[in-house]
Amino acid sequence: NRKDDLMRWARKYQLPFRVPKAFPIKTSRALRGAIAMRSWNQEQAFIDAIFAAYWEQGDGSIGDYARLRQIAATLGVNPDEFEIAAESGPVRAELIDSTNKALQRGVFGVPSIGIENDIYWGKDRMEFVEDHLARL
């Protein structure tokens, strides 16, 4: 099953991993939150915190604003301002635009890696990614 497969990959690469309490989850709020955090130059820190909460700590609540607001606060961002920004029209439009661009490019799942005109999908395709990068 999928959870067993995730555990195998984590063991192989000696990564901290806990099966999330909720899996899979709706990620649109977290994605909009990441876009919103650009306003505070905290986008990457926010993404890292979400990733750690979900995959390392098994926290299945990262799709909920209560949890996302806590993460924003730990990064020094006012939680109310964060949620307002994440729900704003421009942030929603940017996520829709980014999603449409990914679909037009041929992305159909996560993880997907685009190099030049090629799309590589799945964690088990990293050798192909390495081969492609070596040819550049």
Q: Which residue ranges define each predicted feature?
A:
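Structural alpha/beta surface segment adjacent to cysteine/selenocysteine redox centers
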Residues: 1-57
